[in-house]
Amino acid sequence: MAPQMQILSEELIQPSSPTPQTLKTHKLSHLDQVLLTCHIPIILFYPNQLDSNLDRAQRSENLKRSLSTVLTQFYPLAGRININSSVDCNDSGVPFLEARVHSQLSEAIKNVAIDELNQYLPFQPYPGGEESGLKKDIPLAVKISCFECGGTAIGVCISHKIADALSLATFLNSWTATCQEETDIVQPNFDLGSHHFPPMESIPAPEFLPDENIVMKRFVFDKEKLEALKAQLASSATEVKNSSRVQIVIAVIWKQFIDVTRAKFDTKNKLVAAQAVNLRSRMNPPFPQSAMGNIATMAYAVAEEDKDFSDLVGPLKTSLAKIDDEHVKELQKGVTYLDYEAEPQELFSFSSWCRLGFYDLDFGWGKPVSVCTTTVPMKNLVYLMDTRNEDGMEAWISMAEDEMSMLSSDFLSLLDTDFSN
């Protein structure tokens, strides 16, 4: 049962200094334009640190003050999105909600009920909720929820129209550094995306059509299981021996998707894994990692042979290698991955949030004990995230409810059952 929550206040946090007239309009890139209209949600759970002298009111004031300060650099986040073309950087402000939770933090993060996590967010991030249609123009919103034990949940929704996961991490790192009054704060760059990937005229935003009967579960691969999977590749072809742990976990889950799809449907379509790829380091010259926006594309791998997960690692690596200079040049001409996704196929999508540093986000009262996202109403979608100690990996898998129950016992045996839910 979801804990009772009481909203205490709601206000708009504006930049501490007005945005100059020369920066009043932020153009979307065409990589932004082709993204579905939704928000990326993240929730950070912080325990009550006994050595912290800050009470709830002081923490709240520090968060609001530092947010106002950092918005002078992240000024589009305080504006409003114009349909699918630009952001009006008018300093309207970031919705900032405060709530009291009538339960303990330990109860909230133990055996997490993923469907109940939305209550820690400022609003429903995906279409389908009662209020979701009213928030499309808001780039950023924050909700602070305080537990009876003194613990805190910080829920953030950032519009996918102007940010990818790395952009979210860049903003949160700058916010935490500002909150602690650090001097070495990462400066964002909002211009590179639209300059190198110019917007297209009259391009409609793809409509987010929620799938029905979708469930999301969190599965955890601990360090030992990841090492065992890597050892299984030792006898494989040379090109897959040095695969990353992300590629290995994607291959393992893709194999499950393939088996479930074949068991349920008699399909002749291609079985395709789509991996989100950060383009910043693949640009020539490379973009700084602080470049804001959706500086990303998708790499597509087709399953030719799939007797074992090791057969799928090679195609995954090959698809990533194809995201080279020539591919980027095609993207700059306006060619997008949507052209590929229009082909008949069974598509399984993967996005890695690993190594983005979410467990290092410290506002001045310690690091989070849990980092979560929420249910995405879209089937065959996977988010990969670090575990708290960063030596394991969480897979947040979204599937049709009946298909989730078809995951094999071999797959389930790979997981840390103390954390899967």
Curated annotation (Swiss-Prot):
Pathway: Alkaloid biosynthesis
Catalytic residues (UniProt): H160 (proton acceptor), D362 (proton acceptor)
Protein origin, superkingdom: Eukaryota
Record-listed E.C. numbers: 2.3.1.323
InterPro entries: CAT-like_dom_sf (IPR023213)
The reaction(s) this protein catalyses: 15alpha-stemmadenine + acetyl-CoA = O-acetyl-15alpha-stemmadenine + CoA
Protein keywords: Acyltransferase, Alkaloid metabolism, Transferase
GO molecular function terms listed in the Swiss-Prot or TrEMBL record: acyltransferase activity, transferring groups other than amino-acyl groups; oxidoreductase activity
Changes seen on gene knockout: Abnormal presence of stemmadenine, but normal accumulation of catharanthine and vindoline.
Gene3D superfamilies: Chloramphenicol acetyltransferase-like domain
Disulfide bonds: none
GO BP terms, alphabetized: alkaloid metabolic process
Segments for region (Disordered): 1-21
Tissue expression as described in the entry: Expressed in leaf epidermis.
Subunit structure: Monomer.
PANTHER family: F21J9.9, VINORINE SYNTHASE-LIKE
The name this protein goes by in its record: Stemmadenine O-acetyltransferase
Organism, as annotated: Catharanthus roseus (Madagascar periwinkle)
Source taxonomy: Eukaryota, Viridiplantae, Streptophyta, Embryophyta, Tracheophyta
This protein's encoding gene: SAT
